[in-house]
Every structure is written in C-alpha cells, then in structure tokens.
Amino acid sequence: MARIAGVNIPTAKRVVIALTYIHGIGPKFAQEIVEKVGIPAERRVHQLTDAEVLQIRETIDRDYQVEGDLRRETAMNIKRLMDLGCYRGLRHRRGLPVRGQRTHTNARTRKGPAKAIAGKKK
C-alpha cells in the first residue's frame, strides 16, 4: 500500500479513485493532481513508480490542505463562530441545524434520538 498524506491508499484501485481516500481530496482534486503529475488516468496504484508516488506526495503537500490540517481548520472555524456568539455559532453550540433547515419535525440526526416527555400520551 502506498502511503500518501498519512493515509494508506488501496493498491488495486485506479490512482484517481485511490486519492479520494484522503480527507480533503475529492474526485475533482484527484483528477487535478493526476494531470499535474502527468500520470495516465487508468493507471493503478500498484503500477506507480516510487518517483511518481513521491511527485504525488509533494504536489499534495505543496498545493492542498488535507487530513489533520483541514480538520483542524474546520474545527477552528466552528469554534470562532461559537466564540463570536453569532446565530450560526449558537446553532452549533446547541447542536441544531445551522443552515436554516426546519426543526419542528425532522433534524433527528443533528438533535440526536427523540427524548421522552413525561406526561405526554398519544
């Protein structure tokens, strides 16, 4: 298995697909990386030379924010909103939907399992 950006990527898959296993790299960025490095799109990971793997690794390190750095930045952005006390920050703090979705019904994923209300009958 090739190790890129701290992630073991599967060797049997095509390079474009395997790169999407890295947090922060989707199909679009994976295609971009392969084109920058100059690897054919149908090439599989186990067919890559060490030099090509190194080129991919350097391209990702230089041009993209992935894995831990990306997760850290996302967490810091959410923390900043919460510290500001803005509406979006309050919604994050309360564990409710942030982007204007309805909460009277639905939103169970964000709110967690339904809580029983004492004295309420069907």
Swiss-Prot record:
Record region (Disordered): 99-122
Family annotation (InterPro entries): Rbsml_uS13_C, Ribosomal_uS13, Ribosomal_uS13-like_H2TH, Ribosomal_uS13_bac-type, Ribosomal_uS13_CS
Pfam families assigned to the protein according to its UniProt record, in alphabetical order: Ribosomal_S13 (PF00416)
Gene3D superfamilies linked to this entry: 1.10.8.50, 30s ribosomal protein s13, domain 2
Molecular function as annotated in GO: rRNA binding; structural constituent of ribosome; tRNA binding
Any one GO biological process: translation
Entry keywords, A to Z: Ribonucleoprotein, Ribosomal protein, RNA-binding, rRNA-binding, tRNA-binding
GO CC field: cytosol; small ribosomal subunit
Keyword Translocase: no
Subunit comment: Part of the 30S ribosomal subunit. Forms a loose heterodimer with protein S19. Forms two bridges to the 50S subunit in the 70S ribosome.
Family assignment from sequence similarity: Belongs to the universal ribosomal protein uS13 family.
Function, in words: Located at the top of the head of the 30S subunit, it contacts several helices of the 16S rRNA. In the 70S ribosome it contacts the 23S rRNA (bridge B1a) and protein L5 of the 50S subunit (bridge B1b), connecting the 2 subunits; these bridges are implicated in subunit movement. Contacts the tRNAs in the A and P-sites.
Name recorded for this polypeptide: Small ribosomal subunit protein uS13
